[in-house]
């Protein structure tokens, strides 16, 4: 079963089996503006929840991307090397950043559902 969750640091997480696909939310890309460069994590890297795993540079700012869960990076979106603008065009689809194998499914409970995330954004 596939489920989509969000973090307070503006990452989205689509979970299927024990693999999570991660990207930044539409709200985050709107704040950043036009993305010009993405620094992605290495495949095989073990990451802990909350650790900086990637960074995104735009014409306005640079932003860190945090691991929403603990686990191992199993794939990165190599299209972003030549087409970083995919993050602006389709942040929650073609503009995904990386996939990770989840090591602690208990951490899923800390993630927000879509309604809770929208409410969080409205309060910022």
UniProtKB/Swiss-Prot annotation:
Gene encoding the protein: gcvH
Record keywords: Lipoyl
GO CC terms, sorted: cytosol; glycine cleavage complex
Record keyword Metal-binding present: no
Cofactor binding description: Binds 1 lipoyl cofactor covalently.
PANTHER family in UniProt: GLYCINE CLEAVAGE SYSTEM H PROTEIN, GLYCINE CLEAVAGE SYSTEM H PROTEIN-RELATED
The keyword Lipid biosynthesis appears for this protein: no
GO biological process, one term: glycine decarboxylation via glycine cleavage system
Co-factor(s): (R)-lipoate
Protein role: The glycine cleavage system catalyzes the degradation of glycine. The H protein shuttles the methylamine group of glycine from the P protein to the T protein.
All copies of domain Lipoyl-binding, residue ranges: 19-101
Protein origin, superkingdom: Bacteria
Family: Belongs to the GcvH family.
CDD domains registered for this protein in UniProt: GCS_H
InterPro entries on file: 2-oxoA_DH_lipoyl-BS, Biotin_lipoyl, GCV_H, GCV_H/Fam206, GCV_H_sub, Single_hybrid_motif
Subunit structure: The glycine cleavage system is composed of four proteins: P, T, L and H.
Name listed for the protein in its UniProt record: Glycine cleavage system H protein
Source lineage: Bacteria, Thermotogati, Thermotogota, Thermotogae, Thermotogales
Record-listed N6-lipoyllysine modification sites: 60
């Amino acid at each position: 079963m596939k489920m989509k969750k969000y973090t307070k640091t503006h990452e989205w997480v689509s979970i299927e089996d024990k693999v999570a696909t991660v990207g930044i939310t539409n709200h985050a890309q709107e704040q950043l503006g036009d993305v010009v460069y993405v620094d992605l994590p290495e495949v095989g890297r073990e990451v802990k929840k909350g650790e900086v795993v990637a960074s995104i540079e735009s014409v306005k700012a640079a932003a860190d991307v945090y691991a929403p869960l603990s686990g191992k990076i199993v794939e990165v979106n190599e299209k972003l090397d030549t087409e970083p603008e995919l993050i602006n065009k389709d942040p929650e689809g073609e503009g995904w950043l990386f996939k990770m194998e989840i090591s602690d499914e208990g951490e899923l409970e800390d993630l927000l559902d879509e309604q809770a995330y929208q409410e969080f954004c409205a309060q910022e």
